[in-house]
Amino acid sequence: MSAVEQHIPNDQFLQKLTAFYRDSKIRGPKSVYVTMKPYDGRTKAMPKGSTFKEGDEISCIFRAKWGSKKIATEVKAKEVNKFHTQYSAIIVAQMVNLEKRKKTDDEKKKTGATKA
């Protein structure tokens, strides 16, 4: 992406996120990273100690990264419930992709020692 991040529409974000999860199961990196944070439209950092003003409409920005591919969307306060419902459905559907982490020999020794 360029220096100024381009946000895609929410529906398109969810479609691409689903594709990221599907592709991570088939090929490429196994991990898909999703982050979210409050967003007020600024492109530069806020000074220390400053907070959102009462008049500001606070929205939420969702970012997803899979390998070198990145996507982002801005969810307005009015659309949060609808978006969260759709996002939750995607996450629940992708839980089948979870794999049990393989423990190293050191971790096996530590857990065995604590059980005794």
Curated annotation (Swiss-Prot):
The subunit field of the Swiss-Prot or TrEMBL record says: Heterodimer with ZK512.4/SRP9; binds RNA as heterodimer. Component of a signal recognition particle (SRP) complex that consists of a 7SL RNA molecule of 300 nucleotides and six protein subunits: srpa-72, srpa-68, SRP54, F37F2.2/SRP19, F25G6.8/SRP14 and ZK512.4/SRP9.
What GO molecular function annotations does the UniProt record carry, in alphabetical order? 7S RNA binding; endoplasmic reticulum signal peptide binding
- Phylogenetic lineage: Eukaryota, Metazoa, Ecdysozoa, Nematoda, Chromadorea
This chain's source organism reads Caenorhabditis elegans
Q: Where in the cell is it found?
A: Cytoplasm
**UniProt name for this protein:** Signal recognition particle 14 kDa protein
Question: One Gene Ontology cellular component annotation?
Answer: signal recognition particle, endoplasmic reticulum targeting
Coiled-coil positions are: none
Q: Which InterPro entries match?
A: Signal_recog_particle_SRP14, Signal_recog_particle_SRP9/14
User: In terms of domain of life, where is this protein from?
Assistant: Eukaryota
Family per record: Belongs to the SRP14 family.
Entry function: Component of the signal recognition particle (SRP) complex, a ribonucleoprotein complex that mediates the cotranslational targeting of secretory and membrane proteins to the endoplasmic reticulum (ER). F37F2.2/srpa-19 together with F25G6.8/srpa-14 and the Alu portion of the SRP RNA, constitutes the elongation arrest domain of SRP. The complex of F37F2.2/srpa-19 and F25G6.8/srpa-14 is required for SRP RNA binding.
